[in-house]
C-alpha cells in the first residue's frame, strides 16, 4: 500500500490540472503561434510561468486505483501488476484467466 499522503498529493495535483487546463492551453497556444508579435508571446510565457507548477499535466503520476502503487501500472486497467495478479487470481476481473501451457 502506498503512503496516503502521496496518493492525496497526486489527487490535489489532478484537481489543479483540471482547474487550470483551459487557461494553460490558451497561453501555450499564444506562445507557440509564430504569427504573433514576440512581445505578446513573451508576456504569455511569463503568465504561463506564474501558474502553479502542479497545474501542469506532466506532474501527475499514474497510480493504481486499488493500492496507490506508482510503478508497474497498466494504463488500460488503471491498476498495478500486483493488484492485477491478486484480483485476477480471485476471479474478480472479467475475462482474466490464469495462463497455462
UniProtKB/Swiss-Prot annotation:
One of its GO terms (molecular function) is rRNA binding. It comes from the Bacteria. PROSITE patterns: RIBOSOMAL_S14 (PS00527). GO terms for biological process: translation. Keywords: Ribonucleoprotein, Ribosomal protein, RNA-binding, rRNA-binding. One of its GO terms (cellular component) is cytoplasm. The keyword Transmembrane helix does not apply. InterPro entries: Ribosomal_uS14, Ribosomal_uS14_bac/plastid, Ribosomal_uS14_CS. Part of the 30S ribosomal subunit. Contacts proteins S3 and S10. Belongs to the universal ribosomal protein uS14 family. HAMAP family: Ribosomal_uS14_1. Binds 16S rRNA, required for the assembly of 30S particles and may also be responsible for determining the conformation of the 16S rRNA at the A site. This is Small ribosomal subunit protein uS14. It comes from Brucella abortus (strain 2308). The lineage of its organism: Bacteria, Pseudomonadati, Pseudomonadota, Alphaproteobacteria, Hyphomicrobiales.
